[in-house]
Amino acid sequence: MPLLLSGRGFRRELESAGCMAVHAPLEGGAETRLLRRLRAAGYRTHLTSARGLGDPEVFLFQKHGVRPPHLGHQSVGRGAAVGEVHDVMPLLGEVFLGDKPVVLWLLEGQVLSRSELLSLCDLCRREPRLKIVVEMGGARSLRWQPMTQLLAA
């Protein structure tokens, strides 16, 4: 049985564009197949959700503060006026340690605003080893296009 999707065309377009928008079938399977093909081609991959991303550059590359959930408890003068803040390590901190290129696959990318998507494209331009794939919704068959083309339309 021949392979239905070798991933070679997707990889070539991802390397040239840097940031891709993907519309994948809702039953799944196509994205994991592409991730497996990218890993076999020498990429490091990281799969995460776009929900709660905040400022993409800070969240991915810098140590940043996150407020824990409230859970209905009263703070009795323990924190500052803004409440407790926990320092969190960057999401892609350890992934960038080697020389391998990195693919960040963002699920549920349709929740991101236009400015957040543009900032992701700028990150790919500034960091040549970083490639970003954003799932922008479902489709009957797997299709992709550069993010700049999607945002220009």
UniProtKB/Swiss-Prot annotation:
Keyword Transferase: no
Catalytic reactions on record: a plastoquinone + NADH + (n+1) H(+)(in) = a plastoquinol + NAD(+) + n H(+)(out); a plastoquinone + NADPH + (n+1) H(+)(in) = a plastoquinol + NADP(+) + n H(+)(out)
A GO CC annotation given for this chain: plasma membrane-derived thylakoid membrane
Membrane topology: Peripheral membrane protein
Origin superkingdom: Bacteria
Protein location: Cellular thylakoid membrane
Matching Pfam families: NdhN
Coiled-coil features, chain-numbered ranges: none
Membrane-spanning intervals of the chain: none
Keywords from the named record: Membrane, NAD, NADP, Plastoquinone, Quinone, Thylakoid, Translocase, Transport
InterPro entries: NAD(P)H-quinone_OxRdtase_su_N
The EC number(s) this enzyme carries: 7.1.1.-
Record-linked HAMAP family: NDH1_NDH1N
Family, per entry: Belongs to the complex I NdhN subunit family.
Function noted in UniProt: NDH-1 shuttles electrons from an unknown electron donor, via FMN and iron-sulfur (Fe-S) centers, to quinones in the respiratory and/or the photosynthetic chain. The immediate electron acceptor for the enzyme in this species is believed to be plastoquinone. Couples the redox reaction to proton translocation, and thus conserves the redox energy in a proton gradient. Cyanobacterial NDH-1 also plays a role in inorganic carbon-concentration.
Subunit record text: NDH-1 can be composed of about 15 different subunits; different subcomplexes with different compositions have been identified which probably have different functions.
Protein name as annotated: NAD(P)H-quinone oxidoreductase subunit N
